[in-house]
């Protein structure tokens, strides 16, 4: 049976449109509660959220749905996704729920779940919820209704968890760090963690109003951070996204380092301390230069499908700890059960402090191949694999690039977009090929029979 509502990272959409409506979210929570009650007499669910204005409404709907199924609820308030995962495990809750659409703008929102162990839930569990959604509600009698309470020190508990991942004999004293929390879930905890580790912190993107999450700030708009690092003559800049499960870092020169580079640095730091790293999981998008640099160190590299869910599955299957993707989702399963933007940033800063080296020095072995990523809006009910013009263009581009480049075409798991990626040793070639593929996709959907408007192969 196929899943109707769950995507690659829970359920996500535009608020007020199915499935992100109060009535559906209430039914969803009720269905999840019924699944939990099959194995637990009195389940307890933790609910956290980011700073979107719709979070209040959806939080109330979840609370009502869970209580109606006989499930108790603990409200955490605004908290990074990894904080919810941590507290779900630490509080021995039955389930963790996050209300967030991650890096998307405020009109979107979503619901995602964590198991009692703080990890993403299985396809089988999601299918069980889909099945329960298709059945009539089974309202619990009044005597067995659930209750709700707030965990007032949730943020402080997560702050301590983050600090405890940093070496006790090191600190950030003497470092000036700009933190951009994207007006999102880490707007309070992010600056506090860094300050309590003795850094001088300039906080930007830390004034949420319910409508400004991810708006020209955060990991999806790193230029804002780069400008702030220059303006404040900072040593480092840290960019998080709306739910703080991803991170990008800027050095004192304004150079931006993506998740691929930070993943390599984390591996190199561990190996430099004689830790064994048997293998690393990236994605189909991971830069080829990182793969080669890891292999040169004797580290096996495996590509999973795009998305931290699939990285996690592959890491678990192989019993490895480290994985990540260029967007800044980084996994260190011996530190946390899920991607943690603040925790990953601390690992990187710790490596710099311990070695007394800059990011550029630590990443001297990696020179990324130019990559061009374009987004093409997918028309409703269109299967990109049947686009004949795009298929022909892919074949032509792959022949031109040969072994020195890569083409990756995929549908986004969270938005109605086709992702077009071209990687080549030459930046202009990568750009022209990506533009050709994007134009081919658009032309194919518009019913065109040729690519007259596409740039010629190899054009600047």
Curated annotation (Swiss-Prot):
Top-level EC class, please? Answer: isomerase
Q: What is the free-text note on the cofactor?
A: Binds 1 Mg(2+) ion per subunit.
Q: Which Pfam families match?
A: PGM_PMM_I (PF02878), PGM_PMM_II (PF02879), PGM_PMM_III (PF02880), PGM_PMM_IV (PF00408)
Names of required cofactors: Mg(2+)
Identify the GO cellular component terms for this protein: cytosol
The record's account of how the chain is modified after translation: Activated by phosphorylation.
Single biological process term from Gene Ontology: carbohydrate metabolic process
Keyword Transferase in the entry? The reply is no
PANTHER family in UniProt: PHOSPHOGLUCOMUTASE (ALPHA-D-GLUCOSE-1,6-BISPHOSPHATE-DEPENDENT), PHOSPHOHEXOSE MUTASE
UniProt record similarity statement:
Belongs to the phosphohexose mutase family.
Q: What does this protein do?
A: Catalyzes the conversion of glucosamine-6-phosphate to glucosamine-1-phosphate.
Name recorded for this polypeptide: Phosphoglucosamine mutase
* UniProt source species: Verminephrobacter eiseniae (strain EF01-2)
């Amino acid at each position: 049976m196929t899943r109707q509502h769950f995507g690659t990272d829970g359920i996500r959409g535009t608020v007020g449109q199915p499935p992100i409506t109060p009535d559906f979210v209430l039914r969803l929570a009720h269905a999840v509660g019924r699944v939990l009650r099959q194995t637990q007499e009195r389940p307890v669910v933790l609910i956290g959220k980011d700073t979107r204005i719709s979070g209040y409404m959806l939080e109330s709907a979840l609370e009502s749905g869970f209580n109606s199924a006989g499930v108790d609820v603990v409200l955490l308030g605004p908290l990074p996704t990894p904080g919810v995962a941590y507290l779900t495990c630490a509080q021995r809750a039955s389930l963790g729920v996050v209300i967030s659409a991650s890096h998307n703008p405020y009109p979107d929102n979503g619901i995602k779940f964590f198991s009692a162990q703080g990890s993403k839930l299985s396809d089988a569990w999601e299918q069980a919820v889909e099945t329960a959604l298709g059945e009539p509600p089974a309202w619990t009698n009044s005597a067995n209704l659930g209750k709700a309470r707030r965990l007032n020190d949730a943020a402080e508990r997560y702050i301590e968890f983050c600090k405890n991942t940093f070496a006790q004999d090191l600190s950030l004293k003497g470092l000036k760090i700009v933190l951009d929390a994207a007006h999102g879930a880490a707007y309070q905890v992010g600056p506090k963690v860094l300050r309590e580790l003795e850094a001088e912190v300039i906080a930007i993107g830390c004034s949420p109003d319910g409508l400004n999450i991810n708006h020209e700030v955060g990991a999806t708009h790193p230029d804002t951070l780069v400008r702030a690092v220059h303006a404040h003559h900072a040593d480092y800049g840290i960019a998080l996204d709306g739910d703080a499960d991803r991170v990008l870092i800027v050095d004192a020169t304004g150079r931006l380092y993506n998740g691929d580079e930070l993943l390599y640095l984390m591996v190199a730091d561990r190996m430099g301390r004689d830790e064994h790293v048997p293998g690393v999981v990236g994605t189909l998008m991971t830069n080829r230069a990182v793969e080669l640099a890891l292999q040169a160190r004797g580290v096996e590299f495996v590509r999973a499908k795009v998305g931290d869910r699939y990285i996690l599955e592959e890491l678990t299957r192989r019993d490895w700890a480290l994985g990540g993707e260029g967007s800044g989702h980084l996994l260190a399963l011996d530190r946390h059960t899920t991607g943690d933007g603040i925790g990953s940033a601390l690992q990187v800063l710790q490596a710099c402090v311990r070695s007394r080296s800059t990011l550029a020095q630590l990443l001297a072995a990696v020179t990324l191949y130019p990559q061009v990523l374009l987004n093409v809006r997918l028309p409703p009910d269109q299967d990109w694999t049947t686009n004949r013009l795009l298929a022909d263009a892919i074949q032509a581009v792959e022949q031109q690039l040969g072994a020195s480049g890569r083409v990756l075409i995929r549908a986004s798991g969270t938005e109605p977009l086709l992702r077009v990626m071209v990687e080549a040793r030459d930046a202009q070639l990568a750009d022209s090929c990506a533009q050709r593929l994007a134009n081919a996709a658009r032309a194919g959907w518009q019913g065109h029979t040729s690519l007259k408007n596409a740039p010629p192969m190899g054009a600047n």
